[in-house]
């Protein structure tokens, strides 16, 4: 685990974005942890979040031309990541996002920002079922662009309805790499460093044993 990944876990815990306990997910599964990126909800939170996304992007080594944030959660993520890439990595990248509703006046269309072209890095909070990615792929392909990769905050590394995870399905279906700031493996490594969190460690390991990929 790299220093920025440990810092991201501590940041998420401090904002209660990441919580340990017992939670029922939309899928009906009982999970020993919960991650709600919507609680990164202040200017400072967003500034820090962008820096973590930028670190993961640079760390990945994936080459791309443009950042794309799917509406709605991906919009502030793409924006703050673009700012962080310019401020901390001297890379001034174009970014764009889609509207859920196409405008019928003014500039029109359902895209805002730079022209959607070239190799696109899609940024979002998490991938649960992969639906947002599939919708985004239709937009990317309709504009003649290609998907270079996908960056999310957390990879839960757990099976979907079948034997593989929603992330593995996206990688398979679109022949792209999905990268994340942290993974379930990183969470476990972090808990192993914290003796006072031993009960959570046991629960997360048991969960991985049952649902992990």
From Swiss-Prot:
It is an enzyme of class 2 (transferase). It holds the Pfam family Pribosyltran. Homodimer. It comes from Escherichia coli O7:K1 (strain IAI39 / ExPEC). Its EC number is 2.4.2.10. It catalyses: orotidine 5'-phosphate + diphosphate = orotate + 5-phospho-alpha-D-ribose 1-diphosphate. Pathway: Pyrimidine metabolism; UMP biosynthesis via de novo pathway; UMP from orotate: step 1/2. Catalyzes the transfer of a ribosyl phosphate group from 5-phosphoribose 1-diphosphate to orotate, leading to the formation of orotidine monophosphate (OMP). One of its GO terms (molecular function) is orotate phosphoribosyltransferase activity. The gene is pyrE. This is Orotate phosphoribosyltransferase. The keyword ATP-binding does not apply. PANTHER family: OROTATE PHOSPHORIBOSYLTRANSFERASE 1-RELATED. InterPro entries: OPRT, Or_phspho_trans_dom, PRibTrfase_dom, PRTase-like. Disulfide bonds: none annotated.
């Amino acid at each position: 685990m790299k220093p920025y990944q440990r810092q991201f876990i501590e940041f998420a815990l401090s904002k209660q974005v990441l919580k340990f306990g017992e939670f029922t997910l939309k899928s009906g599964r009982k999970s020993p942890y919960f991650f709600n990126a919507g609680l990164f909800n202040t200017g400072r939170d967003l500034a820090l979040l962008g820096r973590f996304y930028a670190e993961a992007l640079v760390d990945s080594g994936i080459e791309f031309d443009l950042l794309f944030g799917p509406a709605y959660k991906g919009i502030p993520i793409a924006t703050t990541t673009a700012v962080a890439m310019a401020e901390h990595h001297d890379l001034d990248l174009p970014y764009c996002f889609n509207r859920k509703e196409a405008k019928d006046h003014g500039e029109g269309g359902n895209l805002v920002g730079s022209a959607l072209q070239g190799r696109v890095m899609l940024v979002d909070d998490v991938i649960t079922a992969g639906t947002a990615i599939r919708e985004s792929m239709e937009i990317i392909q309709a504009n003649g662009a290609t998907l270079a990769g996908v960056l999310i905050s957390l990879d839960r590394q757990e099976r979907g309805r079948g034997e593989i995870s929603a992330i593995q399905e996206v990688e398979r279906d679109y022949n792209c790499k999905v990268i994340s700031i942290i993974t379930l493996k990183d969470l476990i490594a972090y808990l192993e460093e914290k003796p006072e969190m031993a009960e959570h460690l046991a629960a997360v390991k048991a969960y991985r044993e049952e649902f992990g990929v």
